[in-house]
Design a protein with these regions (language model features):
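Metal-dependent phosphoesterase core characteristic of DEDDh/y 3'-5' exonuclease domains
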Residues: 8, 12-25, 29-31, 49-175
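Short histidine-centered catalytic/ligand-binding loop motif
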Residues: 28-40
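A short, well-structured juxtamembrane/interface segment
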Residues: 37-52
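Short, small-residue-biased leader/transition segments that mark boundaries at the very start
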Residues: 2-7
Length: 175
């Protein structure tokens, strides 16, 4: 029942990549170059097999917006094995899904995905490891709110503060 990150692989391809979508993926061209990267590169098939094995073993996956990730790799993970912070922090009274960045700022007091806020395409602008750790911390925070009987109050606070800050962490003032 250990809740920790266990896969840190990047998928390489032999096909030419037209756009790395760095502002969303955090990936730079060197990251997927086997001669230059410090990342563990695996094929799509290997990544799929790892996920399939973990799914078959009954592992639970914790993340933010996992449905899209699973759809991209073309794998079905039973809903009972998915803990998605998009769903955990969704209020039936509000149609909006909350971003990982906003949830991390509001609940964890961490400003993640800083390159996204600045519109900067830099390696540390978005980091899948940082996102995975934030989702894990948000899940633990959710469990804490649930244990303490404060879940409903916290959700009300989230949806009250969100519109005031346009659902984003306030901009930091340069010193």
């Amino acid at each position: 029942r250990q809740r920790q990150m266990c896969i840190r692989d990047s998928i390489w391809t032999t096909e030419p990549i037209v756009d790395y979508l760095t502002q969303f993926s955090g990936i730079q061209p060197d990251d997927l170059d086997p001669k230059r990267t410090q990342r563990t590169l695996v094929s799509h098939k290997t990544a799929y097999k790892k996920l399939r094995m973990l799914t078959d073993l009954g592992c639970r996956f914790i993340g933010h917006g996992l449905a899209k990730d699973f759809r991209i790799i073309n794998i079905f993970v039973p809903p009972s094995q998915v803990i998605d912070t998009v769903q955990l922090y969704h209020s039936p009274a509000h149609p909006r899904n909350l971003s990982l960045r906003f949830l991390s700022w509001f609940l964890l007091k961490k400003d993640i995905q800083q390159g996204l806020a600045l519109g900067v395409e830099q390696h540390d602008g978005h980091d899948s490891i940082e996102d995975a750790l934030a989702a894990l911390q948000l899940f633990r925070k959710y469990e804490q709110f649930e244990r303490d009987g404060r879940l409903e109050d916290m959700l009300e606070d989230l949806y009250e503060i969100g519109p005031r800050v346009n659902w984003r962490p306030p901009e930091k003032i340069a010193s």
